[in-house]
């Protein structure tokens, strides 16, 4: 198994030319992952209001180079009488370098935010039209040292519902990359029957 420490694995797998092909449709199609990035953050107001993180949405306002500026809110039922209800913050996210900032108070002096890194690489892959795979089943997905799936990696596994990128296949095994919550990237063999292609369009926000 290969482990990359604290280095966004997108920089290991894509050339800079790939970034220019991202379109507005891609940002719309992959919006659920940006929502997850923001919802998992340590933004002060999200914590103070104890907002249901499942209701948080990041509505993209502008895009400049790799930076996305978005309005973050949680009220799905806003009316013309209360247009600002549910507003949380303005955020800027660099989808290449995986950097999230709160720019609500002072855009020139933003607050650096932490977030769940599992969604960063998935969002990037989605924007670049890479095939995303999701772990299925009810049990943990075991990592193996070989494509025969005969030698398990001790203590290394992925939970159902997580996302992975498939690099290559061999028989009934797939060599995958998985980015953990702390940003560490793991690469190893898994049982191909435990992963399936995932289409972002299948989820309605």
Where are these regions (language model features)?
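C-terminal partner/receptor-binding element of secreted or periplasmic proteins
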Residues: 101-129, 190-205
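Short, non-transmembrane alpha-helical segments in secretory-pathway proteins
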Residues: 21-59, 127-131, 147
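SH3/SH3-like beta-barrel superfamily modules
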Residues: 157-193
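Core beta-strand residues in small-molecule sensory/regulatory alpha/beta domains
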Residues: 75, 141-146
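Bacterial N-terminal signal peptides that target proteins for export
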Residues: 1-7
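Exposed beta-strand-loop-beta-strand "reactive/processing" segments of non-cytosolic proteins
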Residues: 53-96
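N-terminal signal peptide c-region/cleavage motif recognized by signal peptidases
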Residues: 13-20
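Short alpha-helix capping/helix-loop boundary micro-motifs
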Residues: 147-153
């Amino acid at each position: 198994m290969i482990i990359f420490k604290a280095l966004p694995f997108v920089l290991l797998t894509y050339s800079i030319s790939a970034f220019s092909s991202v379109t507005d449709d891609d940002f719309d199609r992959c919006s659920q992952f940006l929502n997850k990035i923001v919802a998992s953050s340590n933004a002060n107001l999200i914590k103070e209001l104890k907002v249901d993180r499942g209701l948080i949405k990041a509505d993209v306002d502008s895009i400049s180079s790799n930076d996305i500026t978005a309005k973050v809110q949680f009220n799905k039922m806003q009316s013309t009488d209360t247009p600002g209800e549910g507003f949380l913050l303005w955020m800027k996210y660099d989808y290449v370098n995986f950097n999230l900032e709160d720019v609500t108070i002072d855009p020139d002096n933003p607050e650096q935010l932490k977030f769940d890194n599992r969604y960063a690489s998935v969002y990037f892959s989605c924007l670049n039209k890479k095939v995303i795979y999701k772990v299925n089943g009810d049990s943990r997905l075991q990592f193996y040292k070989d494509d025969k799936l005969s030698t398990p990696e001790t203590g290394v596994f992925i939970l159902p519902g997580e996302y992975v990128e498939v690099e290559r296949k061999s028989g009934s095994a797939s060599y995958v990359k998985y980015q953990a919550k702390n940003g560490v990237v793991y690469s190893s063999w898994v049982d191909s029957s435990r992963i399936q292609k995932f289409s972002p369009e299948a989820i309605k926000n």
